[in-house]
């Protein structure tokens, strides 16, 4: 009650009243009549109006805190005063001290009275502006040592493009190798030191942008980078690189990445050699038909940690190379020799990514040819001839200045030890142990000049500076990639033959085969990257033909799409087109065929992978998809989840849908009991999934059950009773029997030793020679299930003499397909 209201009551009562409306003075005795009739004293508010009190005008009565209300605001009140004393009983609910909302705002205004606060106390009335950021992003485009317009021009020449992936075991140096290339092309060293305090001897880890990747020190997601690099000839190439995780739990990221590349750069730690995950990746890449190149990384560990003599270091290097070749030969017996890796072929790179150097035999031989260019009478050193003599059992005779296959003396050194390893050993030892004056003299002979302040830096920083000056840029890496990994045009035939489900004689197939940027738009999507605030996703894929431009309308064909079943299809419009650079994205007007592209606006209907095509293809051709990604592991680690607050179940379901998009091999489903189950590859994988579910996508607390292993049913003995099905017209009948496979068949199918795509003759010969099947049984295999690498076999065990009608019918492609479909669905 305001001050003005109280003042008005003073006039009405004619008695002193306190600020709370209580009487001040002697207590008035209650009359007997009033007590008997139970009349409240408040009913006489307007009675006994004192004559000596000055009459208040209507305007004064309507003044509230100095502001006037409409004249009708106190109509009832003033009328009561004008009438004088009254004996009328005014009930409490009929009293009116304030005007109604209708009287204040008018008849035409609808007013609503909220008697209870519907907003919970935990929710602020004015919520603060939240800026969520779960990944590291560059605020602006960082400066680079090449012109970005030149990079976009290179995208129009598929012959100058190479699409590769860095793959290997955990902590073998893939991300460090990427850092070396990033620092070579990006002018960010000084900026990082000023803004983050990161020293020159600390690993940059440029492609580790997820918060978990930074905390745990390992890569979880694949990270793309597009860089312009030069070869030893000075020719620029656009190298698109995917840095893949090395942990065995995250090989699903590797499989998704290999679908978009034309070759694999295998990174192996020279000390640890080929590990289990390395072996898995080699087998998968070989079975997918991808060319392999090898990077023997962390060469400095031989010098600084193991302290091996140069001769022993050579044998260690040779052993690592032969380990890789052994796995290739075991995967493809008889064909491995053609795909052999060897330094003299130029497909093996020696590197120390932490020190920022790498070389092939050809690039190291070029250092000698540049140091000894020759004169008029002296031809000088031919780098190609020298490179061919720098590996294997080839020895140098210093007396005759020639190379021999046999050692001249007992302790003769191989040419690789003499010309490659010993200079590196000496460079390391002088840089670490020599005094400043001695080091200056040694470096002066090599043509290396450093600032005086650089000699006073830490030994590790100084060693990195010296190595970068000595070896120069990574031209040897570019030479290896350009020479031994095909361009998108050269690899198109292999890609289409393995992954495209449509015919090869159509206009769309020809456009993809030629990487025609003017052809119909076809994009293969294999990965989804969440935005920095985790509110949405962007689709990452490869443009197979045409040019991806913003505003283009496309059909999004899911993994289950086919000509017969078009349910898994939706329409979308490409809102944005970027060149993906992990920490930043370069917006562009179009990305032509042969390149990788990051798209916005098409992710709503994509779960794992998809194919994007125009709404209508030229000549009204049918649209076909690329096959779903083949993974070389399974999700067998299972947990059940539920929200702590049951009302947050919709938020959890939305988070599970986003988790399903983010992780390629994650599986989410609802059991018959109603519990929500998540299936992953391992404990670390599941830990990352649950972290993202809690913090990134659902932002809620969940309860998680104890982890269990997924179990699958199998057949242990032949069916005792034949199972049959009959058509409605009773004229056709099919009978089936289940029996276990011989030991080892499932492993051979899953490893790719036998393929259902091979001819009946090849398949029959395999089962006949390896498992003793008869010729008829081995050539009667219809399908492997539930996919081409599935451990189940559908076999036609009918004899023409017994059921000639069914046998002839079953051998038609249409009827066979109708039988194979339910078989695949059953075992899925």
Please provide the spans of the model-predicted regions:
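Long, acidic (E/D-rich), serine/proline-rich intrinsically disordered low-complexity regions
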Residues: 2-4, 10-11
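Structural and coupling elements of P-loop NTPases
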Residues: 9-26, 30-828
